[in-house]
Amino acid sequence: MPDVEVVTYLHPSWSSLVDDINREPEGTHILVIGYSLGANNSVLVANATNYIDSIIALQPSIFTSNTALTGKVGRFVEIYNPNPWMTFGGMGSQKLIGPNIEYVTNNDTHLGAPFNPEFRNLVKSEIARLSAEPGPEAAPSVPPPPFPSPR
């Protein structure tokens, strides 16, 4: 997929991600994928930006705060394992709080979750979906002239 930029951040650097998102031109499509504590912090990112097209939160952890989503997100999918014993006592068992979150449960161990083909296919389909939508370069840089008034 052309013109797709991928940047990786460690979970404690979520505020740097916010800064980078806020520097993007209006209309740039943003997909945030967070795993474990990064999944939890995807909510903090959404709450500190104007808009995110899509978030995929993979197995958020119960070992940190569970901040409610208040930011604007077009689509938010959370994949988690409700059985804490399969995720090292809850590292992938947190159910995030917020409107319009699509919850998907799985039986993956915490370390095995990123290798799940359903997760990987979801990531690919979201990238393809957002890549197919017009970006900021599709918007005219100068507004069109007004129509002449009828006489």
What spans do the regions from the language model cover?
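Serine-dependent carboxylesterase/thioesterase catalytic core
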Residues: 16-93
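Active-site catalytic motif of lipid deacylating hydrolases and related acyltransferases
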Residues: 1-28, 108-113
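Structural alpha-beta junctions
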Residues: 1-8, 50-54, 96-101
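C-terminal catalytic-base region of ester-bond hydrolases, centering on the histidine
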Residues: 69-151
